[in-house]
Amino acid sequence: MTKLSYEVSEDINFLDKEKSQFIKDYMTSVKFPWLYSNCSTNIGDENSMFSNVLYSDNQENKYYIPICEDLIKHISPLEIIRIKANLTTNVDTYRNVFDYHTDFENIENGLTSIYYVNTNNGGTAFENGKFVKSEQNKLVTFPMNLKHRTVPHTDNNYERIVININYIKD
């Protein structure tokens, strides 16, 4: 694990290669449904995306087990708050900037982990100035109250796919 700052840590090769490739193949196949949203983090922000809430309100959907089982085993959360898969498409330039946000507020000992399903030149930017590049099988973890945002990709990959995991560790 590499600490990028006092708040952000990065785990490269988080899962074994076979499981990482399975998740990527599964989430880019016709077996996995993506739901369109005409905004990303704030209503009216004009940043569309696709998503699928895999776990929320103590309920998992049918796609939870094949995708999340190994992730959760490695993270070992005390309590899962939400797991959400996000897909954004490539853009021509970086002018399409997503807003800084937190996924949830006022949750004591809350953490957010982002698992990068595929590699591209986008990533996640943090309000403290740190940047994490989207690289397949990387997990970045940070306090839930640290503002972050999607940095869209401009390379030839059609999609940027991440799994956001919000949880309580201790």
Model segments located where?
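Non-heme Fe(II)/2-oxoglutarate
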Residues: 1-79, 91-94
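A generic structural signal for short beta-strands and their flanking turns/coil linkers
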Residues: 79-81, 111
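Short beta-strand segments enriched in hydrophobic/aromatic residues
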Residues: 87-89, 117, 167-169
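A short beta-strand-loop-beta hairpin characteristic of the jelly-roll/cupin
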Residues: 93-100, 108-110, 116-135
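Short beta-strand His + acidic residue motifs that chelate non-heme Fe in jelly-roll/DSBH
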Residues: 99-101, 147-155
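A generic structural micro-feature
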Residues: 104-109, 155-159
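A short hydrophobic beta-strand segment most commonly corresponding to one strand
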Residues: 113-114, 139, 156-170
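Conserved metal-binding segment of the jelly-roll/cupin
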Residues: 132-149
